[in-house]
């Protein structure tokens, strides 16, 4: 492995540690949550459409998403490892026989539809994603419970300290009299 490939692999691993993208391929309907900067504000915008291509490799890998907006076809290319891409959700799995679905540009209406994939591979991927999401929710819930318990313990300690201070103040008053 040469130095360039090694650096790209390190960068990809660093980005993948922060967020993980699901496994998706051309034909899948995806929702890409993109961070958009407008003036001083930053917000997350969802872009939902059909993934029509994946290209490149390593850190330069990208995917193209096509949607129809107000009757006009719009395509947008997203780098896989871009920090502006918050997350990618697979809405449904498509069954296609091509790696590049550029023929969808010429199609309108029903002829542009993609059949949903209900095969075993799609089921396994969907089940794996559901499992990962449920584990993530359970982890977040456990963190919330732990934070609530820590907050309750902190409040109890503060109340105990206040009660002790009040007792000491009463004892000091009694001693002063």
UniProtKB/Swiss-Prot annotation:
Signal peptide: none annotated. Gene3D superfamilies: 2.30.30.790. The keyword Ligase does not apply. InterPro entries: Ribosomal_bL19, Ribosomal_bL19_CS, Ribosomal_bL19_sf, Translation_prot_SH3-like_sf. GO terms for molecular function: structural constituent of ribosome. One of its GO terms (cellular component) is cytosolic large ribosomal subunit. The keyword Transmembrane helix does not apply. One of its GO terms (biological process) is translation. It holds the Pfam family Ribosomal_L19. Keywords: Ribonucleoprotein, Ribosomal protein. This protein is located at the 30S-50S ribosomal subunit interface and may play a role in the structure and function of the aminoacyl-tRNA binding site. Belongs to the bacterial ribosomal protein bL19 family. This is Large ribosomal subunit protein bL19. The lineage of its organism: Bacteria, Pseudomonadati, Pseudomonadota, Alphaproteobacteria, Hyphomicrobiales. The gene is rplS.
């Amino acid at each position: 492995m040469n130095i360039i490939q090694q650096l790209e692999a390190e960068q990809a691993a660093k980005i993948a540690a922060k967020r993980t993208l699901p496994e998706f391929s051309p034909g899948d309907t995806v929702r890409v949550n993109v961070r958009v900067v407008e003036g001083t504000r930053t917000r997350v915008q969802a872009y939902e459409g059909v993934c029509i291509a994946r290209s490149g490799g390593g850190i330069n890998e990208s995917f193209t998403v096509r949607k129809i907006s107000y009757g006009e076809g719009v395509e947008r290319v997203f780098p896989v490892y871009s920090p502006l891409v918050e997350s990618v959700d697979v809405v449904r799995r498509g069954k296609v026989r091509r790696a590049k679905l550029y023929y969808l540009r010429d199609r309108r209406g029903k002829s542009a539809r993609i059949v949903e994939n209900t095969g075993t591979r799609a089921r396994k991927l969907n089940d794996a994603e559901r499992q990962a999401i449920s584990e993530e929710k359970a982890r977040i819930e456990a963190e919330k419970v732990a934070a609530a318990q820590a907050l309750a313990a902190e409040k109890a300690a503060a109340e105990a300290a206040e009660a002790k201070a009040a007792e000491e103040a009463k004892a000091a008053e009694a001693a002063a009299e």
